[in-house]
Amino acid sequence: MGAELPTRPVDIKRIGLDAVDEVTELFLGYLEFYKRPSGPEAARAFLMERLKRDESIILAARMEGEPALLGFAQVYRSFSSVSMAPVWILNDLFVSPHARRLGVGRALVRMVVDLARSAGAARVILSTDESNTSAQTLYESEGFTTGHPVRHYVRRTDG
């Protein structure tokens, strides 16, 4: 598998409340990918609430000079007591199926890492479905690793 090479530069912007409608369609695609379909009103409300409460950063990508959004990333900020520093969680990354392998996902990941570094974050963490091997390949090619001395556990509380 070769590296993604954008045909044109990817333009990435932070999304504010005024642009949530633009990213909602991509967010719906993301939810569908993870088999968690939602209606547009609920998806939009979720994104609006995260931004109103300053709980997340949403980045949106398009090819330079093109109006259509092709991908987005949503980051949540947390902290590491041991590192005594912020930690960024790259929680959501989605690229429209027709725009995959054009460098959009890679550009979004790199932007998240650059912004986290600028904000003094100790690290960026993320997770992906075990079956999503193309995402795993991207993350590993960008320096993300899975072998850590810390084991992560998950316990669902929603049922």
Say what each PLM segment does.
Residues 10-25:
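A short beta-loop-alpha structural element at the N-terminal edge
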Residues 24-49:
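Conserved GNAT-fold acetyl-CoA-binding loop/helix
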Residues 48-60, 89:
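A short helix-loop-beta-strand connector motif used in the catalytic cores of GNAT acetyltransferases and
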Residues 60, 68-77, 89, 94:
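Conserved beta-strand in the GNAT
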Residues 83, 99:
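Glycine-rich phosphate-binding loop
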Residues 95, 101-114, 137, 141:
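Conserved acetyl-CoA-binding loop-helix of GNAT-fold acetyltransferases
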Residues 106, 130-149, 155:
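Conserved active-site alpha-helix within GNAT-family acetyltransferase domains
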Residues 116-128:
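Conserved GNAT acetyl-CoA-binding A-motif
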